[in-house]
Amino acid sequence: MKKLLLLFISALLAVSVQAQSNDKPGNWKLIVSDEYPADDVGVATYTVTTDFNADPTGVQDSRNAFQTALDKLGENRRGGTLFVPAGRYRISGKLYIPSGVTMRGEWKRPVKGQSIEGTILMVDSQGGNETESNSFITMEPSTALTYLSIWYPHQDPENIKPYPPTVLYGRDGVWGNEYCNVRHVTLVNSYSGIILSRSNGGGCPNIYDVYGTPLSRGIEIDNIADVGRFEWIHF
């Protein structure tokens, strides 16, 4: 009987190990760059270009590649980091970052009169309204957006059009929405930059080392349940 039990347990372990190996992420790698130094060292679970064929030239729409990668990391609340190497990525549509997931690029602090460098997400939308449900990036609880820039190529500062928020803290229908983080990010010509959801807010929002040229409002925090942290905001 003991031998049969041991054989049964061994078989279960073998199945479990096999299942994990079939579902393991891509090539884990340290995110280290002399050209784009960071305050910390990240570990990439997936790389959006090599693992999901996103186009870093900005010619092809990369929205599906990004969302597929983010959803993969969010499966079973596994979490992880999606690394977005330096380049320009055209995004025609909305992105959702699931709980426990970080989207991380390569970034330099902007310098007046110089071009933005590093990872640039290009919002390929004509705008026209400011509806929260159409936010460019919506973040669920315990997520992070770090080391990248977001640019609105169709926005004209001389003829400003309303756009939905660039980053929305709090996804409708998801309870909580605590601990959303934006760190080391540049917002180029956002109409509304970082907004805590007016309909489904949360607590403990974090914003650190953010630069930008918002055209209506940079950060809007209301309907908050717990204290947040906001440091080094440069608008």
Language-model features, listed with the residues they occupy:
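Extracellular "leader-to-stem" segments immediately downstream of a signal peptide or signal-anchor
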Residues: 1-85, 90-158, 163, 181-183, ...
